[in-house]
Structures are given as structure tokens and as C-alpha cells.
Amino acid sequence: MEGLGGFLIPLILMFAIFYFLLIRPQQKRQKQIQEMHNNLQRGDKIVTIGGLHGTIDSLDESTVVILVNDNRKLTFDRSAIREVVNPD
């Protein structure tokens, strides 16, 4: 029986380390992204995952219309928004 316990403890320890170093931070980041997408508002300055900078003109449940240079309007999925940029 001692051999089984000697094998099981390192396995559990490796799983715990894997969870706290890889899985938990990813879940936390995903929650932050979802919260940011839910809090988008008209007038927010944003950056898309493709690097396009613009201002939100309008939005609905799944899409966002972004105003870019020369008042051009582009439509993106909400999931394409990488970050909201705070104007300084």
C-alpha cells in the first residue's frame, strides 16, 4: 500500500501545480475579457484584435460598429474587441 501512496501524492501535487499555474490564470483572464465586452459603451475608444483603433459608434448584443478616420464605419463582432483604451 505504501507504493500506491508514494505514487499518488506526487501525481496530485503535479495536478495542483498545473491548475494554479495554467488553468486558473486563463479562467481569470477569460472572465475579465467577458466583463470588458459586457461593459462596452458608445464613445469608448477601442483596439481590435487586428490592431485597428477606433471609437464605438453603436453596438448590439453581438456586433459593434466602429468609427475610424474620415468617419468610416466598420462592423465587427464583439469578440474582436481586444481592449478599451483610456484617453489620457
Curated annotation (Swiss-Prot):
<keyword id="KW-0653">Protein transport</keyword>
<dbReference type="Pfam" id="PF02699">
    <property type="entry name" value="YajC"/>
</dbReference>
<protein>
    <recommendedName>
        <fullName>Sec translocon accessory complex subunit YajC</fullName>
    </recommendedName>
</protein>
<dbReference type="InterPro" id="IPR003849">
    <property type="entry name" value="Preprotein_translocase_YajC"/>
</dbReference>
<dbReference type="GO" id="GO:0015031">
    <property type="term" value="P:protein transport"/>
</dbReference>
<keyword id="KW-0812">Transmembrane</keyword>
<keyword id="KW-0811">Translocation</keyword>
<keyword id="KW-0472">Membrane</keyword>
<dbReference type="GO" id="GO:0005886">
    <property type="term" value="C:plasma membrane"/>
</dbReference>
<comment type="function">
    <text>The SecYEG-SecDF-YajC-YidC holo-translocon (HTL) protein secretase/insertase is a supercomplex required for protein secretion, insertion of proteins into membranes, and assembly of membrane protein complexes. While the SecYEG complex is essential for assembly of a number of proteins and complexes, the SecDF-YajC-YidC subcomplex facilitates these functions.</text>
</comment>
<keyword id="KW-0813">Transport</keyword>
<feature type="transmembrane region" description="Helical">
    <location>
        <begin position="3"/>
        <end position="23"/>
    </location>
</feature>
<comment type="similarity">
    <text>Belongs to the YajC family.</text>
</comment>
<comment type="subunit">
    <text>Part of the SecDF-YidC-YajC translocase complex. The SecDF-YidC-YajC translocase forms a supercomplex with SecYEG, called the holo-translocon (HTL).</text>
</comment>
<keyword id="KW-1133">Transmembrane helix</keyword>
<keyword id="KW-1003">Cell membrane</keyword>
